[in-house]
C-alpha cells in the first residue's frame, strides 16, 4: 500500500520546493516579483550612484551650449541593473548655477535666483559603468525644460 502513495507525495514535495525557490516567493503582496538581473531601486547615497550622477551631469554640461554650469537639484529616482558591469538609471532635476563654464569647481556654486536666469531641466540618464576597469559611458540621455 506504500507504493500508491509514494508518487503523489513525491509530486507534492517537488511542487513545494518549486514554489519555495520561485522568484515570486520572496516578494511582498501587491508588489510584482523582482527579476534576477532586472533593474532595482538604488540609494542616492551609494558610491556608485554618486559617481554615475557626477559623470552624467558632467557630460550634460559638456554638451550644453549654456555659458553656466548646471548641477543636480534633486534625484527623483535612482535604479541600477547588474549586467557585465552596472547600468544606472537616474531621473534628475537639474538647475542652472551662477558658475560659468570657465570655473572648475561646481560643488559650491549656488543656483540662480533671478527669474530671467533661473532655469531647470528634467533629465533621464542611463550610465554604463565597469568599476573594475574604471570606465563609464553615458548610454542614453533625454532632457526637457522643467
From Swiss-Prot:
Note, other: Potential cerebrospinal fluid marker for the diagnosis of Creutzfeldt-Jakob disease.
Primary localization: secreted
GO cellular component: cytoplasm; endoplasmic reticulum; endoplasmic reticulum lumen; extracellular exosome; extracellular region; extracellular space; ficolin-1-rich granule lumen; Golgi apparatus
Protein name per Swiss-Prot or TrEMBL: Cystatin-C
Signal peptide: 1-26
Chain ranges for the short sequence motif Secondary area of contact as given in the UniProt record: 81-85
A single GO BP: negative regulation of elastin catabolic process
Classification lineage: Eukaryota, Metazoa, Chordata, Craniata, Vertebrata
Amino acid at each position: 500500500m506504500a507504493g500508491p502513495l509514494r508518487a503523489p507525495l513525491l509530486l507534492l514535495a517537488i511542487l513545494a520546493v518549486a514554489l519555495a525557490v520561485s522568484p515570486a516567493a520572496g516578494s511582498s503582496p501587491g508588489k510584482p516579483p523582482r527579476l534576477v538581473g532586472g533593474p532595482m531601486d538604488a540609494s542616492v547615497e551609494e558610491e556608485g550612484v554618486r559617481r554615475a550622477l557626477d559623470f552624467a551631469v558632467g557630460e550634460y554640461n559638456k554638451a550644453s551650449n549654456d555659458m553656466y554650469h548646471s548641477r543636480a537639484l534633486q534625484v527623483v529616482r535612482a535604479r541600477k541593473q547588474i549586467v557585465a558591469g552596472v547600468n544606472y538609471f537616474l531621473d534628475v532635476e537639474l538647475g542652472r548655477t551662477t558658475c560659468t563654464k570657465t570655473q572648475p569647481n561646481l560643488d559650491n556654486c549656488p543656483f540662480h535666483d533671478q527669474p530671467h536666469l533661473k532655469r531647470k531641466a528634467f533629465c533621464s540618464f542611463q550610465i554604463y559603468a565597469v568599476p573594475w576597469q574604471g570606465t563609464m559611458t553615458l548610454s542614453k540621455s533625454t532632457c526637457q525644460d522643467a
